[in-house]
Amino acid sequence: MLKNLSPSWTQVYYNAIEGYFWSPELIGRGATGNPKPWHEWHEGLLKKELPLNHILNLFFALTQQGTRDRCVSHLTGIPLTGMQFVPSVSVIQTVSSALTQPDLIFVSGSRLAFVELKVGSASNLDQFAKYVLAGVRLRAEYPEIEHVHLAVVTRPGREATVWGSRQYADIATLKAKAQSMLLDESTAWQSAAMKKFARDSSAETKRAMADAVEAISVRVVSYNELDQALAGEQSRSGEEDALVSGLRSELSARKLVSLGNTNRI
């Protein structure tokens, strides 16, 4: 019975949000008239990407080093060790919030890894280019970084359309399009940040950017991959890990993993 009274740590996160829901003056917000009941807001939050970003930020900030390394390695497809979690706000001045704010950032020695989380929306060519540019700027600030990796995590079955079009299901095609736009000095980007880059950057800078497009490793996976990595951590430890089990429960509650994964929770 006592176990049933102990909530998952992710529920504690939502409880904290509920506190601000009932006391908005604590964050300088005025009360709104006739708000929807909290449970309706909670149900809505389970469909949003931002709370999931927060939860995964907390998980990777608090989890053990080995778990962090193995999960990031599983997502990127690259064996990585010593990966440190870096809050996005720590690099905003270098990257520029107008460019992009990576969902998850990890760094270890010569390697930098970005993880982009998708729940309901798709990514696009501009967002890919902005991640490449973020890597270029961070490498300029931290010369020890030699390799940049990007993992995009989406719902099962959406891997082929995560860039908004099946024509980019092949990463090589995605890279080729980005490079051609850079080398042809195209201004046909969609985002203000990339339009500004195309307008203000020299031909040499654009060539360097095109080289970075070629060099970045990109992998698109579903949340099943993350869940499988977490399941592996549970099997490895042989005992209950509240952080891992809580995150798996969150992915299941959000219906981000397929039935083949959820029945192992």
Segments (PLM) and residue ranges:
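Charged, terminal alpha-helix-loop-beta segments
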Residues: M1-I265
